Amino acid sequence: MADKGLLLVLSGPSGVGKGTVKSAIVENKVFPFEYSVSMTTRKPRPGEVNGKDYYFVSEGRFKEAINNGELLEYNNYVGHYYGTPLGPVKEMLHEGKDVLLEIDVNGAQKVREKMPDGVFIFLTPPDLHTLHLRLEHRGTESEDVIRGRIKQARNEILEMEDYDYAVVNDTVANAVDHIKAIVDAEHVSVKRVIDDYRKMVEED
């Protein structure tokens, strides 16, 4: 009955598999939603497509977006800027479409400040050893950078209490199933539908 779309925020430490889980949701059409493409100043990784995975832009263009108030949130992570364009998110939610954001932990905190009605999911690894192996498997960063990411992951995991749900990414299939269950439940939660039913009673 609700007209407004659901904002779903998928976050977690670097290397936990946010992008992989997001891709599985998209490719398998697990539930209908619009994916909000983030903007970044980092270079594309192998296989990443501009406009699909990220909008890859220069630092100058990114700072222009900041100054113009075009971003819902942004952050500088390991020397690169990441941000979420605000306009498309607001437009899609207004049209009643569910929107999926895949962002880092700092970004998720900023989104919660501006859009507290969103559903915030923390994607966590089974353990830190598994996270270390996943970062090594990427083959894109030095051991020093990986150690830094693991250290940051420890701190980020302790911030899980600020989220609505925690999903362990032991396998992509399991993580996707849990996220779908969360979305299904949120669509019928009383806090999201109560206003519609109040209107129904008043109009009868």
Swiss-Prot record:
InterPro entries: GK/Ca_channel_bsu (IPR008145), Guanylate_kin-like_dom (IPR008144), Guanylate_kinase (IPR017665), Guanylate_kinase_CS (IPR020590), P-loop_NTPase (IPR027417). One of its GO terms (cellular component) is cytosol. SUPFAM superfamilies: P-loop containing nucleoside triphosphate hydrolases. Keywords: ATP-binding, Cytoplasm, Kinase, Nucleotide-binding, Transferase. ATP binds at residues 12-19. Its EC number is 2.7.4.8. This is Guanylate kinase. It is an enzyme of class 2 (transferase). Belongs to the guanylate kinase family. Disulfide bonds: none annotated. GO terms for molecular function: ATP binding; guanylate kinase activity. HAMAP family: Guanylate_kinase. Its main location: cytoplasm. The gene is gmk. Essential for recycling GMP and indirectly, cGMP. Residues 5-184 form the Guanylate kinase-like domain. It comes from Lactobacillus acidophilus (strain ATCC 700396 / NCK56 / N2 / NCFM). It catalyses: GMP + ATP = GDP + ADP. It is found in: Cytoplasm.
